[in-house]
Curated annotation (Swiss-Prot):
One Pfam entry name: Phe_tRNA-synt_N
Catalytic activity from the UniProt record: tRNA(Phe) + L-phenylalanine + ATP = L-phenylalanyl-tRNA(Phe) + AMP + diphosphate + H(+)
UniProt-recorded name of the protein: Phenylalanine--tRNA ligase alpha subunit
Binding note for cofactor: Binds 2 magnesium ions per tetramer.
UniProt: Mg(2+) binding residues: 246
Name of encoding gene: pheS
Organism whose genome encodes this protein: Sulfurovum sp. (strain NBC37-1)
GO CC annotation terms, alphabetical: cytoplasm
Keyword Protein biosynthesis among UniProt keywords: yes
Entries under InterPro entries matching the protein: aa-tRNA-synth_II, aa-tRNA-synth_II/BPL/LPL, Phe-tRNA-synth_IIc_asu, Phe-tRNA_ligase_II_N, Phe_tRNA_ligase_alpha1_bac, Phenylalanyl-tRNA_Synthase, tRNA-bd_arm
The keyword Metal-binding is annotated on this UniProt entry: yes
Length: 330
């Protein structure tokens, strides 16, 4: 018995212990051979022999189980040590993303007007002639339509050339007073250093009872907005023409590159054109069924603002997905 237990305790691996198990407990093992002898033992002695053999088997099984647990634990410990990971080592650090400079600029513009209680309105990019042109005082064959090279679909419809149709849809669905901006993508057939076929605009509209909205209000809010975007710049309004506003104006800021002294960027004028605005033409209000109201509207190109804020010379580079350029704006 002691020799058999010693065999179990001397096993130094699970493989060796398995061989001992087969030798002791297998069908042809030592214990099986002892139980086979019972048939030759006389009746009176058989009971005592069986009891002694069962006790021996139980003791050996307990010794085997205990040794198995010890060896199993040692094997697991060895495996864990061999597969250990030094958690103090730095892993692969994922680079953080960032907003595209156009979207960052768009968000900054929207934040300004939302703080002044302007609603943010959206509309479809595929428009019809009425919302994109006719309701904005651009009837068929109006020469001003040539100012915007339009993408037309074969059957009907077009890609909107500005976000002004959102203003028309809002006025058709809402009664005055209205304070809204319409940010979004617009499309024109143009591609050069300062134009792309798809770009982004933010247009604004304020409508109220006649006499409550004036050009002075428009100048005040746009001057404050431009100084919010570009810092302490001078702002000037120049007479201009837009079919949907009368009077109309182009808005310039003193050149942020030369501080108004004159440079190549501002064509040595000291000024940079940034947006257009004006008092809403009565024909626009007539198209949406408004009476006895007045209002002002303005519109700006987000890419133009992004180029000025980040001093980007070529508009097209904003849409080429060049990581070397974009990672500079994190």
């Amino acid at each position: 018995m002691e020799n058999l237990e010693a065999k179990i305790l001397e096993a130094d691996s699970l493989e060796v212990l398995e061989k001992v198990r087969i030798e002791l407990f297998g069908k042809k093992g030592l214990l099986a051979a002892q139980f086979a002898k019972m048939k030759d033992i006389p009746g009176p002695e058989k009971k005592a022999f069986a009891e002694g053999l069962n006790k021996q088997k139980t003791a050996l099984q307990e010794a085997f189980d205990a040794r198995y647990e010890v060896l199993k634990a040692e094997e697991i410990e060895k495996m864990l040590k061999s597969e250990a990971i030094d958690i103090s080592l730095y892993g692969a650090v994922a680079e953080k993303g960032a907003l595209h400079p156009v979207m960052e600029t768009m968000d900054k513009i929207i934040d300004y007007f939302v703080a002044l209680n302007f609603a943010v309105e959206t509309g479809p990019m595929v428009e019809d002639d009425f919302h994109n042109f006719e309701a904005l005082n651009l009837p068929k064959y109006h020469p001003a339509r040539d100012m915007q090279d339009t993408f037309y679909f074969k059957d009907s419809g077009l890609l909107r050339t500005h976000t002004s149709p959102v203003q028309i849809r809002t006025m058709l669905e809402t009664k005055p007073p209205i304070r809204m901006i319409a940010p979004g993508s617009v499309f024109r057939r143009d591609y050069d250093l300062t134009h792309t076929p798809m770009f982004h605009q933010v247009e604004g509209l304020v409508v109220d009872e006649k006499g409550k909205v004036s050009f002075a209000n428009l100048k005040a809010i746009l001057t404050d907005f431009l100084q919010y975007m570009f810092g302490d710049v001078e702002v000037r309004f120049r007479p201009s023409f837009f079919p949907f506003t009368e009077p109309s104006a182009e808005v310039d800021i003193s050149c942020i590159f030369c501080e108004g002294k004159g440079c190549r960027v501002c064509s040595h004028t000291g000024w940079l054109e940034v947006l257009g605005c004006g008092i809403v033409d009565p024909n626009v209000f007539k198209a949406v069924g408004y009476e006895d109201v007045s209002g002002y509207a303005f519109g700006l190109g987000v890419e133009r603002f992004a180029m000025l804020m980040h001093k980007i010379p070529d508009l097209r580079s904003l849409f080429e997905g060049d990581i070397r350029l974009l990672e500079q704006f994190r």
